[in-house]
Amino acid sequence: AYVTGLKNLLDALNGQSLRHLFFISSTSVYAQDDDSWVDENSATEPARFSGQLVLAGEQVAIESGHPATVIRFSGIYGPSRQRFLEEVIAGRMDPQSPAPFSNRIHEEDAAEAAAYLIRQSLAGRQLEPRYIASDCEPVRLDEVVRWVQQQTPCAEPTPDARKGGRAGSKRCANTRLLATGFTFRYPDFRAGYRPMIDDLTG
């Protein structure tokens, strides 16, 4: 879908010009596993097939001949994406310690980041070809789990509890996005998960 779908869309334009093309991508294009910070200029050498497809889609967008911007979202969470929170409360998440770094963005901030950049383009402002959209605090997964356990009663981890998230350990820098003037409603996991915990347990 990332490659074929975009190519089909561009073909359907039949030579019509776009004011600006936005491609929704993912930080899965980064394969770093050494706790390092990554930004829009960092190496993209995804080992997983899904990350390779996303990166190929990015290239189609950038080389489309239209003004284009790629937005690389980290893990999206929120009221409609609360599996992780439910797993911690139910004892189905028990990461190693220290765990790999994790990166996330609340679904409201994700939607607003895309809308904000679109508005910037419509206002005639020059956009960069790539932006990382991730909140302001990369954090080790076990720290997030411990914090949730401190906020609400959680079941003891089960023997088959998951030990972690996806492979890799990197810290995604959102400096370029912040430089546009964008502000996060949920700048870290605490701000985002606290109301979700209240809704789940209230």
Residue ranges and their predicted role:
Residues 34-70, 97:
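Catalytic helix-loop patch of NAD(P)-dependent Rossmann-fold dehydrogenases
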Residues 20-23, 69-75, 132:
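Structural signature of the Rossmann-like NAD(P)-dependent dehydrogenase/reductase core
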Residues 24-37, 43-46, 76-80:
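Conserved catalytic-site region of short-chain dehydrogenase/reductase
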Residues 165-202:
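C-terminal amphipathic/interface module of NAD(P)-dependent oxidoreductases
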Residues 85-97, 154-158:
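A short C-terminal helix-loop "cap" of Rossmann-like NAD(P)-dependent dehydrogenase/epimerase domains
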Residues 70, 76, 82-86, 96-118:
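Substrate-positioning beta->alpha
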Residues 1-22, 56:
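NAD(P)-cofactor binding segment of oxidoreductase domains
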Residues 111-113, 120-165:
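Mid/C-terminal beta-alpha module of Rossmann-like enzyme folds, strongest
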